[in-house]
Amino acid sequence: VLAECHIEELDYGIIDQTPFFCTCGIGFDAFISDRFAKAGKRGLLTYIENTLKEGLKYKPDTYEITIDGEKQVYKAFLIACANANQYGNNVYIAPHANMSDGLMDVTLMEPFSMFEAPQIAIQLFNKTIMSNSRIHSFQCRHLHIKRSSPGVIHFDGDPKEADKEVDVRLVPKGIRMVVNTQEQPYQPPLLQMFSEFYHEVNEEISTLGANIRADFLEGQRRISTVNKELLRKLRKKP
């Protein structure tokens, strides 16, 4: 790579005066980043465990976002600002994001039910999240977010406490990097298994009878069972 010395000018972002290169965000992804940092152990399994444990209990916030002087109000599960197209580990939060187009891809995810969670997980892995009805997306260079109270944000997965008003902007072609032009996409076996398992879960949930769908407590129990089975399979994976 160094011998070839292929240099590209890439964009980077700044959130709350802190630079980021792939993604930053506010809401559930920032909340999980904070829990992950405090978990005492690292690794994909810890991240998935925290996500499954906290996902159904998390309370979405209401956000006022300003883009190019226009204000809009949303209740959102998360707001992700992407320079690159994924969080990492093949989880694509903004499949069309490009690190050299001079724009941030913003993905806003509305609150969703527990029955919708497996489908959202699948779509994050197979790059089809933009087709989900809970998703709003747009491009911009500058975004101002106002929430109800101060709280955690994240930059490239690292958590940080911030005020209730957060500013995010993109710096076009602000960094020069040596890149590998021969890099091939790679799907880790663990991630492949996780995606396949959630596909099985989604099929099971889609066949639940009307009585179970009407009974929230029973549905919640089944989802909890699914989560425990997922963690069991992950722990058995070499």
Language-model segments: residues:
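Glycine-rich phosphate/pyrophosphate-binding beta-alpha loops
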Residues: 25, 29, 80-94, 159
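Glycine-rich, charged/polar anion/phosphate-binding loops
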Residues: 8, 48-52, 61-68, 89-94, ...
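Gly/Ser/Thr-rich active-site loops/lids in small-molecule metabolic enzymes
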Residues: 38-46, 95-116
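Catalytic core of DAGKc-family lipid kinases
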Residues: 1-77
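ATP/nucleoside-binding phosphotransfer catalytic cores, i.e., glycine-rich phosphate-binding loops
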Residues: 67, 73, 98, 108-238
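A generic structural signal for short beta-strands and their flanking turns/coil linkers
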Residues: 59-61, 75-77, 100-105, 139-141
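A residue-level signal for conserved active-site and pocket-lining positions in enzyme catalytic cores
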Residues: 13, 32, 79, 106, ...
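Short beta-strand-to-turn element immediately C-terminal to the catalytic PLP-Schiff-base lysine
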Residues: 15, 33-35, 81, 109, ...
